[in-house]
Amino acid sequence: QANASTIANNFVSANVDLILANATTALQACAAATTDIPILGTSVTDYATALEISDWSGTTGRNISGTSDLAPLDQQEDMLVELYPDAKHVAILYCSAEANSKYQATEFEKYLDEDGISYKEFTASDSNDIGSVVQSATEYADVIYIPTDNTMLKSVIRNSATEHRSNQQYRTSGRNSDYCRRGRYL
């Protein structure tokens, strides 16, 4: 966050015409740095959550616009059910410091509820906690769902969660292309 704030403040000091903020942290830093310079966001899942807008109307009502990277959660849940029809317990694994991840988890849970699938959230506050959280999740779940979550993505790819479930089938569900390249994607 500190680096993003420094960069955003440098843009404001340079009086740039437009700021392109890539990801939630950058968007939040830019939003805090200026209310005048137009900001375009990208790789932001939910603007209302990222900007703490409680009465969301579909626009921010300020100098910020952009695109969302949210893939339809109902379709993700449908795919999970189709690929793993025997799944009874889904672990939802995310970093509690990422507001957009919490948003996705909460929304995804609604679809699991509709299909009568039990779930439990497993959160890590930072990358130091992920190993033990993944271990707990693999002990609970038939399938692990990981929303778009940069902290979790980096750690799960770096330290394969499959190490925690040796000699057992391990299934993950997520929507990031890096999961796919490493064989951890639906």
Mark where each language-model region is.
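Short hydrophobic alpha-helices and adjacent helix-cap/hinge residues
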Residues: 1-186
